Amino acid sequence: MDFKIEHTWDGFPVKHEPVFIRLNPGDRGVMMDISAPFFRDPPAPLGEPGKPFNELWDYEVVEAFFLNDITEQYLEVELCPHGQHLVLLLSGRRNVWKQELPLSFRMSRGETKWEGKAYLPWSYFPPNVTKFNSFAIHGSKDKRSYEALYPVPQHELQQGQKPDFHCLEYFKSFNFNTLLGEEWKQPESDLWLIEKCDI
């Protein structure tokens, strides 16, 4: 499954090589490959590469959201060209109930481009993922740029509206069965069973 982020969050074409994301689901989880321009802005987070870093969204980052649109349970994965990552599990819009989960993430960086490879175990995914969106952020202050695979349609923009990646209504249909066959069933997640018990 290949995706290119070709628009800003509000629907304008990006002015650079688009961020490319490939998802390869397998027996134990999903391999997520990223190829993206490297902007070097803002500077690297202070956290150790290879480790979770809270509020990574304030830096240069590529994000993927996997949503069950009936329950509004979703997985948010953030990957940074400096090696830090952030995995959040949410139940209800913006309602984080688990964060900074460990992640197998490798990246390599050139002068103007970076590539990343993250392994997302099935246990991180909410049951029955039905929708997907992906985002990229870079730049500082008034040069901050927010990009979306599925942006807010321009005719729906409100005056003064700010970028918000948790507008779940703009996510689009997504089905792992397209790659894994109609018979395939998403493995149950112990993590999400725990969340269900906590409610």
Swiss-Prot record:
Taxonomy, superkingdom: Eukaryota
Family, as annotated: Belongs to the UPF0462 family.
The protein's name in its UniProt record: UPF0462 protein C4orf33
